[in-house]
């Protein structure tokens, strides 16, 4: 319906979320799991950044990306964003964080960024 060929979600594998993982797979997402570690506070960390960038670069070089949508607020992805812009492959960044909390490094790339909080309000208005 939306013309999406492939939608990845990179995340740490936490067994108690197996029902969510199944739901996402049934919805058509390709899940890429990373072994988790726990920080000093007991918080699970998946550290998927390098895996995401590696897969994105592989897909780009193998011609599997026409237009990319990246969901992030993390400036660590700014080199990937710049690469996609140079290749005319970036559609938009969807930021889960507000404008104020989204990384300045992403903003400096010149990419179009839509903030999910803003989109939520638009969707709520449309559903009424």
Q: Where is each model-derived feature located?
A:
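Terminal and domain-boundary accessory regions
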Residues: 1-128
């Amino acid at each position: 319906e939306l013309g999406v060929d492939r939608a990845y979600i990179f995340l740490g594998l936490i067994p108690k979320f197996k029902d969510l993982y199944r739901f996402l797979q049934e919805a058509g997402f390709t899940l890429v799991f990373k072994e988790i570690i726990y920080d000093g506070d007991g918080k699970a960390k998946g550290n998927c950044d390098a895996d995401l960038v590696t897969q994105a670069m592989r897909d780009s070089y193998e011609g599997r990306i026409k237009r990319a949508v990246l969901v992030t607020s993390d400036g660590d992805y700014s080199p990937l964003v710049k690469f996609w812009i140079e290749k005319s492959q970036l559609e938009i960044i969807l930021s889960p964080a507000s404008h104020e909390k989204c990384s300045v490094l992403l903003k400096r790339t010149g990419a179009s960024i839509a903030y999910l909080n803003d989109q939520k309000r638009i969707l709520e208005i449309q559903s009424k």
